[in-house]
């Protein structure tokens, strides 16, 4: 067997997330169906570095899979790209070592979250931004977001029901700015891993702080208390993008 690593992008609007689910349309299912056709009915399982939720988009999701025989990478990329649905793009494919694993190999993930703060909202971007029509103080959010940088137990920012025991993660970058062209707010988070709905919960909390409903110190209170009830709401996922995954070496 020969192992391949692929970088893919997708519009998450019509997907029920990345991971295969029974009777639902997912990114994993669509790619595996295409690989099945390309490999003469041989079942191919793909593994994803991140399990994006329903409606969440990706510019730089990474997957890996094993094929029975070695193939020329550009021909493989072209075939997979042209035969998957139009809301999936296969950006790059490369051959990797047999022990490479896209999820467990040490890496840095970057997520981006777009918020349409306009009144009225931009209807053309309703699937690609999350609308928040209330007054926001960006300076308060910029001050608060700095408290997320570093190594912390993010229990207070994860969704209930997660099976992950160790909730300590390291965030190396956390910023919020306003895009001058679109006027959207852009939240950016880079780190060694993120818990279930962590980014959406962090953005929901920062918006409450920007709106004056929570103090700037609330981020530190949530981290120290590990109490999900003290954080903001889980904001809808249509503004969330898996931007990039960078592997060591």
Curated annotation (Swiss-Prot):
Please name the SUPFAM superfamilies in this protein's record. Answer: Pseudouridine synthase
Active-site residues are: 53 (nucleophile)
Quickly give the catalysed reaction.
uridine(38/39/40) in tRNA = pseudouridine(38/39/40) in tRNA
- From the UniProt record, which GO molecular function terms apply? RNA binding; tRNA pseudouridine(38-40) synthase activity
Record's Pfam families?
Answer: PseudoU_synth_1 (PF01416)
Q: Which residues form a coiled coil?
A: none
Q: Which family does it belong to?
A: Belongs to the tRNA pseudouridine synthase TruA family.
Task: Write down the NCBIfam families for this protein, in alphabetical order.
Answer: hisT_truA
Protein name as catalogued: tRNA pseudouridine synthase A
Species of provenance: Streptococcus pyogenes serotype M1
């Amino acid at each position: 067997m020969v192992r391949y690593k692929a970088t893919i992008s997708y519009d998450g609007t019509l997907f029920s997330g990345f991971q295969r689910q029974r009777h639902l349309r997912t990114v994993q299912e669509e790619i595996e169906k295409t690989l099945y056709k390309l490999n003469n009915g041989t079942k191919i399982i793909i593994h994803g570095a991140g399990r994006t939720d329903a409606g969440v988009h990706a510019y730089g999701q990474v997957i890996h899979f094993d094929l029975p025989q070695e193939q020329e990478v550009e021909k493989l990329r072209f075939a997979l790209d042209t035969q998957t649905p139009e809301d999936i793009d296969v950006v790059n494919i490369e051959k990797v070592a047999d022990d490479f694993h896209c999820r467990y190999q040490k890496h840095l993930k970057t997520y981006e979250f777009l918020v349409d703060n306009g009144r009225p909202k931009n209807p053309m971007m309703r699937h690609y931004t999350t609308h928040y029509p209330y007054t926001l103080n960006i300076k308060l959010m910029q001050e608060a977001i700095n408290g997320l940088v570093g190594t912390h137990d993010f229990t207070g920012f994860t969704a209930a029901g997660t099976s992950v025991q160790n909730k300590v993660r390291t965030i190396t970058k956390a910023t919020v700015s306003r895009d001058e062209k679109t006027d959207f707010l852009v939240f950016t988070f880079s780190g060694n891993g993120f818990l279930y709905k962590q980014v959406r919960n962090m953005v929901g909390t920062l918006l409450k702080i920007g709106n004056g409903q929570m103090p700037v110190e609330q981020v530190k209170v949530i981290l120290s208390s590990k109490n999900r009830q003290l954080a903001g709401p889980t904001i809808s996922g249509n503004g969330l993008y898996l931007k990039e995954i960078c592997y060591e070496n």
